[in-house]
Structures are given as structure tokens and as C-alpha cells.
Amino acid sequence: MSAQPEQTVKLTVDGREVEVPKGTGLIESAAFAGVEIPVFCYEPRLGPPVGACRMCLVEVEGIPKLQAGCTLTAQDGMVVKTAQTSPKAAQGQNATLEFILVNHPLDCPVCDKGGECPLQDLTFRWGPGASRMTFPKRTLEKPIPLSPTISLDRERCILCYRCTRFSENVAEDGQLVARNRGALSLITTFEDEPYSGAFTGNVTELCPVGALLPTQYRFEARPWEIQNVPTVCGLCPVGCNISVTTREGKAKRVLSRNHPEVDGGWLCDKGRFAFGHVAAEDRIREPLERVRRRGFAPLSWEAALDRAEALIRAAGGRIVTALSGSETVEQAYALGKLLRVGAGAHSAVLPEATSSALDAFAAPLSTIGHAELVVVLGDEAVTDRAPIVDLWIRQGRRNGAEVTEAADGNSLPEELTERLRGSDRAVLVWSGRGGGGGARLAELAYSLGFEGKPGCAAFHLPATPNARGVADGWAAAAEGEEQDPEPVALLVVSGDEAAADPAVRAMAERAEHVLAITMYHGLAVGWADLVLPGTSYLERDGSYVNLEGRVQRLRRATIPPAPDELAWISRLAERFGVAVSPHAAVVFAELSERLYDGLAYAEVGERAPLPARPAYQAPPPAAVQPSPPPPAPPGEHFLADLRLQRYRPLFSGPAVERTPELQFQRPPAEIELAAEDADRRQIATGDTVSVRSNGTAIELRARVSRALAAGTARIAEEHAGDLHRDVEVVKA
């Protein structure tokens, strides 16, 4: 059956005839004709237009009064005149700007929006050259701290309602509201509580004036002093496209670059505000060697490479490499060549990665926003693993999709399974731990007939930003069987995220030597014999593979305090007779032949495409089986009748820990208990409880949840310490 031709309408804008799809708004229709209609409040991503600012006034033939262009839909035969051809519309826009500026403070020289302000630009083009008002301007208390991350200047606010509409329609938190009415309207939060949530910072980018500003950027730079470096966020697997604003080589703010298929122009607060971690006080800026009784002593780079070479050679291949999933593909590949080819060490602890079998069901994340049925699997909140995916799910629900949650693919009701099988716009999202999650999801999608349906997709949300790329890069570095060296002569730990893995921590305790590659004086340093400085995603050139399977470019925005990983890996590999380039582009060209069908570095560009879907290839049976939980270690015995679930909240991890403005968002030190288990123990929310596990005991605040399954308990990973999988919880 052939597709129905798209219905179109013809209209005339400023004497130019244009044909557009039926239902297109007038603002977009005018843009098709090459005519700009100025706007303040209009933003299609925020939902239906509200016509609040009246900046878009146009004259429509047959209608006596000026109309708000943003509220109009193109009609066949419509004749529109904008301010460029209609004196009436020009006068209306001039008057609109004059009224907006009546109480505006005109403090452009000290306003952080000055030089990149739509109000400045439109006033220059369409507004009055001078004010007729002689009375004093209204003054208000300022700045108002909406939260530790956002400052509000109410004198500058033009009441476009972009911020309140974002809060109500996109984030759906309803925290930002307009209090009072008319000229007395003020933007605020209910009960003046701090504006908190995963996505609050987006209002600072939506604001068309300097009313809402990130506190980190106030009085930091002017637009003519900065550079905006296009790169990709490296704090979760979505891979949001960002611009890092730098001044004199230092990061000052992060803005969205709006990839409509990946992030839709939104950022989470972690990605927007946590850039300050690169300047943390405990940053490691030079190699360190453990010296008996004296802690650590700094080393020259030459001496550090000598020491690293000696450790690797002495290990004789009995080396395990623990990768965090934050490395670039090039770093993982280069480290793999050094250790696998140069030292014959093939054993690695890799982050939980998305299965390549899911490539057969790959699709842009924006597919979720147009789905009719979304099923979320797993036991972790989508916001914690991939926050922007949560916004896509919310958008899908607003567009009419049914959103259902289930524990796993094995427990789907038969009726839901049949609906998934019969749908052409169904999406599966797996958010949770468990070995084989991606492979099991691929099998489920295949069994539901998703293959060959462009509107159907399956997304696995890894816990780390580049899990897929790191696993692929390590595997492509060399051929060789995975080993299980015992005892471990050398443990190479890359990043504090890897060090937080209980399996890695247990291995570090019994390894003869530990080489840590890390940015901070954190967990990994406590075990290390040799520490080599690591870098942030803001300081790297290279590539990441996001959860869609999209290869994206990282560009260095700030200069690291020490040589980056590729630089010293290249020098160290040379000592083992292995050729590794210190340049990411050269390394990418080499690995691309093995991984990406020869994709050129330049082809990745600033807005990377999504590869075409291959035919489905079933994952090996071992990949589909859930990983068995590690056995409880020997030690003091407790009646441990609850299974502990560790999870990583969005506002956790090394970057957030080192961002003062985000401390109010960090997870409380608490344990979440199922209501049934709490009742048995006579525990209520707010009680202090002791959590015990094989000789380890910690005290936490209890929170009772009716959404948690009986027999399980949840603790944020940063508060779980050395607790094992089976715990006992008693009232303290």
C-alpha cells in the first residue's frame, strides 16, 4: 500500500508565496519564506504557544486587528504582512518593546546576558531609539537565589513564561510558578523552596534576557572574551551535545548544542554544572609513587614511566586492567595495545556495556518521543542512569504514548506482549543492573518482531558514559583469550568509578601491586604503588559511543595539568615495541578499520549520524545469562535476609562531589526499605538503622517505600561502603 501524499497549504508572507505542510505554524512558515518574525516567548519544545510577549505581531489580510503570529497556523490562501512590510505591524512591535523596557533596568554593561541578549538585538532592530518615560523605574530585591545553581533578577524579567512552562510541561515538576497577576507578577517557587531537580538549569538557557543566570557564570566573562568549544558530555551514556564556554583556557559554563535526535536541546544539571571538577583542589597534577612511611612522593614523568615499565615487566602477564567506562575509545584501544600486545595481559574488568546485538534495533532517542507504547524494564530510575531519556519518555507520554514499567522481560503480561508484537511504534528501555542486560533486551526485541520496524527500538542504559566504546576499543586492540591470573601481580585501575566496583576493591586488596590512573586523591590512590594523572572528558580529544551506538567526537575544551593518557601510553608502549600514536585522530583511523567500517574522524563531525541497522545476530548464550551474584566473603556471620541493591544516583560520583553548587542535590545517607520489611522490623521513615554485612556495619537513615519489592533494600553506592549483597537491617 503506497503512502498517502503529504497535505500542504500555500500562503503568502511579505509578498513571497510559500508551500508548507498542513498544520505548520506561522513562525515556521515565514522562516520557509526567508522571513523572520521576532519572538521572545515562543519555543516549540515547551508545548502549545501562549502568545505572552506579543513580539510576533503580524497583519493578516481579512482580520482587522494585529495577531500574535506564534499562535497562528498556516492556512491555505492566508496573506500575512510582518513588520518588514506592514507599518501597522512595525508600530505594534515598537510599542511592545517600549512597554517591555518601561521597567527594564537597562543594565546591559553589567548584565551577563549583554552581547548575546535577544532583547538587546530585537530592541536595536525593531524598538524605539529613546524612551518617553520620565518616572522612576520599579526596583526589586536582587539577585534572588532560586537555588545554589541559579540566580533570579526579577527586574530584568519580561514575563515570557518560558521558565514556568519548562517546569510545568517538560520537566513536569511544577516547581516554578508566576505569583500574583498583571504588572505585579513574579517568577518564584512554591513556598520559596529551592528550585531542585534533574533539569533545572535549562531555564537559564531558555531565558531570553538576563533574569535567570547560572551562578557559576555571573560576572565571569563577556561574549567577546570567550570561546565555545563543541564537544560531548561525558557524565552519562546519552552523550548530550554541548558547547563548553572557556575564557583564558578555563571552563566557565556549559550550554546545549541541541542534537534533535539525541538530547532535544536539553541538559541535566549534572552535565551542565559539574564542569568545575577539573579545577578540584585534590586534583593530581603529577605522577606519584608510594614511599614507605612517607605516603606519596612526586616523580618526574621519565621516572614514572620507568617505574610503570618495571611493574608491567615484573608482573609477567599476571595483570588485570579495570576500566571505568569513562575513557575514550582511543584510550581503551591504546591501553589495550600496551598491555595486551606489549605485555600479554588480556584480563580486564570492563564496565557493563550495551550488547552489539542491539544494533539491529538501534534508533535515535527521539523515537521514544513519538512512540505509542513504551515499556521500561529494570530496577533503577531512568533519571539516575540516563536523565535525558526520562525527558524523552515524558514527551512520549504527552504525545499519547502509554508508558508501562516491568521488572524484566520475562515477566511481561501476555496482553502487553501481544500489543508490543503488533505495534509499529513500540520502545523498550532497560534501566538496571544485571549481567547480560543488553543481550537479553536484544533477544526480547527480536522475539517481539522489532526487526525491520523503523519505529520500534530497544535501548539499554549502561551505568557509565562510554561502556560500549571502552569494551569495543579494548577488544579491538588484540586477539587473545581472557585470562584469570592468580595471584594478580599488577592491577591497573583507570578512574575512581572503576575503583568503586566491589570486585575491583576485593582484587586490589590481594594484588601484589596497583597502578592507578586517576584525576583525584580518591579511593584508587589508597591502594596504589604508582599513580599517573588522569584527565576529564573536557580535556580530551577522542570519541565516545553513546547508548544508541552513535560514535561522537570529544574535543579538548580545557588544557589538562599533565599530559593526557594517549601521550604517556604512547611513550610507554614504545618501550615494549608497540606503536601507539599520541594523537586521537591517528588512533581512531587505526581502530576504525576494525570497529566502524573505516569511518573517518572528520565524518563524525559536530553532529554525528546514527549507523544503519544491521541484521540481527543472536548474542552468545553466555552473554544472555544474568551474572551470578558474587559469593559472600568469609567472615563474621549475620542473619542477612535482605538483598542489597546498590545504585548510582544522578547527583553522585567524583564530578558532583567536587562541585559545591550541586551539594544540595546529592543523595542523603539513607537506606530504602520495602514497606513489608520495615513493618516486620518496626522501622519508620526517619529512624536510624544499623546495616550489617559480614563484619561491616554502618548507620543510615531509613526511608520506607511501597514501590520496592519485599526482601530487597537500596543504598546509593557512595553510602554503601564495603557492604556485600546480603545485609541485615536493625533499628539502632
Language-model-detected regions and their locations in the chain:
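Active-site phosphate/pyrophosphate-binding segments
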Residues: 305, 407-484
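Glycine-rich, charge-decorated loop segments at or immediately adjacent to ligand/cofactor-binding or catalytic sites
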Residues: 358-359, 411-414, 522-528
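Acidic/polar loop patches that form or flank catalytic/metal-binding clefts of enzymes
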Residues: 212-218, 245, 251-253, 321, ...
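N-terminal export/assembly segments and adjacent metallocofactor-ligating motifs
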Residues: 2-25, 31, 43, 59-63, ...
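A generic structural motif
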Residues: 344-355, 400-409, 447-467, 513-521, ...
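Charged, low-complexity terminal tails
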Residues: 37-39, 46, 51, 68
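Acidic, glycine-enriched active-site microenvironments
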Residues: 56
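A cross-kingdom feature strongest in bacterial/archaeal respiratory oxidoreductases
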Residues: 42-45, 336, 370, 374-376, ...
